[in-house]
Curated annotation (Swiss-Prot):
Superkingdom of this protein's organism: Bacteria
NCBIfam families in the record: ruvA
MF term (GO), any: four-way junction helicase activity
Phylogenetic classification of the source organism: Bacteria, Bacillati, Cyanobacteriota, Cyanophyceae, Synechococcales
Domains as described in the record: Has three domains with a flexible linker between the domains II and III and assumes an 'L' shape. Domain III is highly mobile and contacts RuvB.
Record-given protein name: Holliday junction branch migration complex subunit RuvA
The species this protein was found in: Synechocystis sp. (strain ATCC 27184 / PCC 6803 / Kazusa)
Function according to Swiss-Prot or TrEMBL: The RuvA-RuvB-RuvC complex processes Holliday junction (HJ) DNA during genetic recombination and DNA repair, while the RuvA-RuvB complex plays an important role in the rescue of blocked DNA replication forks via replication fork reversal (RFR). RuvA specifically binds to HJ cruciform DNA, conferring on it an open structure. The RuvB hexamer acts as an ATP-dependent pump, pulling dsDNA into and through the RuvAB complex. HJ branch migration allows RuvC to scan DNA until it finds its consensus sequence, where it cleaves and resolves the cruciform DNA.
Pfam families membership: HHH_5 (PF14520), RuvA_C (PF07499), RuvA_N (PF01330)
Family named by the database record: Belongs to the RuvA family.
Signal sequence extent: none
Amino acid sequence: MIQFLQGQVVTVTKNIQNRWFLILSVNGVGYELQVPHSLAQQWTPPPPEPQQVFTHLLVRQDQIALFGFGRLAERDLFGQLMGVTGIGAQLAIALIETLGLEGLVQAVVTGNVKQLCQTPGVGKKGAERLALELKTKLSQWHKLQMGTGETDSTLPTTALLEDLEMTLLALGYTQTEIQQAIAMVSQVPDVAQSEDPEVWIRQAIGWLSDH
């Protein structure tokens, strides 16, 4: 299996179905990869220096496709999503595009169906199934990604999370900024053990102010 490719980004394009592709030249061979919108934006225009892309090769009876990601964790999460009943490659990449790595893991682990439904093509039943099938797996996977052993970040409950998101959105922060802040402050022991929304809000605002 191809784990990653390293080469020159030649072109970045969007097709009529709003899917993003890039051509990566590796030792004289041009590889076409479908990539998330965020990576396409990052490499538009194509950077002059060689780039590394983590890949997932999809082989089906009627299709062979290569998907590319800027982060190894994104590639691994894509593979996890593909194992869920009813989640194909396009819906998996849409989930990553819409919620981002941290936001998607957080939504699944906390069972935040409302947040998962923000992704086009994901309904309530699909979101519930996604959370049900992946909650335990992603909790364990998240611990490994964080590189910790016995201790790890603890994500807020769904109700607390909704209060936190609404407050930060009202203060003008974007969904991406909010997801990043929650992922970071959830690693602070005093915050992780608290069920007080004010504690989470104060820490999140503090982190956002410094970044």
